[in-house]
Amino acid sequence: MSYVGHLVKSFTLWEFVKAHALTLKYFFKPKATINYPFEKNPLSPRFRGEHALRRYPNGEERCIACKLCEAVCPAQAITIEAEPRDDGSRRTTRYDIDMTKCIYCGFCQEACPVDAIVEGPNFEYATETREELLYDKAKLLANGDKWERAIAANLAADAPYR
């Protein structure tokens, strides 16, 4: 750049003008931010949130105590104990997830042959104590009951890719 061109740009504060033009360009566009927590963006069907155990429509638990989720968990956050039932099938007596260890990888959901353990749509589960992040079977089933409609819709939307 010539000395004269540099002098003209410096004298007219060309960079200052360009910066203000860019600011004015975006000033009148619609805002990209949302007013959280009063507004919420839609979540992807593949979103990995709070864990839940699902039930069949007749109310029976889906988990067949195969322990694949426990085996595949890289963080070793899942603990399962099972007993055989009178009809010969197995059901869980204890199903615990330590959410302080969980890395939300989704391997447990992928490994489950009956879609019993899923990661639901809830992402707001901050707690005041560490003990509240140790989910037992009752808490997981309650989550499943609470989010069943959303979970079923997300699994149906994701079905072509599974």
Curated annotation (Swiss-Prot):
SUPFAM superfamilies: 4Fe-4S ferredoxins. Its main location: membrane. [4Fe-4S] cluster 1 binds at residues 63, 66, 69, 112. Its cofactor is [4Fe-4S] cluster. Binds 2 [4Fe-4S] clusters per subunit. Residues 53-83, 93-122 form the 4Fe-4S ferredoxin-type domain. It catalyses: a quinone + NADH + 5 H(+)(in) = a quinol + NAD(+) + 4 H(+)(out). Gene3D superfamilies: 3.30.70.3270. GO terms for cellular component: plasma membrane. Pfam families: Fer4_7. It is a peripheral membrane protein. It is an enzyme of class 7 (translocase). GO terms for biological process: aerobic respiration. Keywords: 4Fe-4S, Cell inner membrane, Cell membrane, Iron, Iron-sulfur, Membrane, Metal-binding, NAD, Quinone, Repeat, Translocase, Ubiquinone. One of its GO terms (molecular function) is 4 iron, 4 sulfur cluster binding. [4Fe-4S] cluster 2 binds at residues 73, 102, 105, 108. Its EC number is 7.1.1.-. It is found in: Cell inner membrane. NDH-1 shuttles electrons from NADH, via FMN and iron-sulfur (Fe-S) centers, to quinones in the respiratory chain. The immediate electron acceptor for the enzyme in this species is believed to be ubiquinone. Couples the redox reaction to proton translocation (for every two electrons transferred, four hydrogen ions are translocated across the cytoplasmic membrane), and thus conserves the redox energy in a proton gradient. NDH-1 is composed of 14 different subunits. Subunits NuoA, H, J, K, L, M, N constitute the membrane sector of the complex. Belongs to the complex I 23 kDa subunit family. This is NADH-quinone oxidoreductase subunit I.
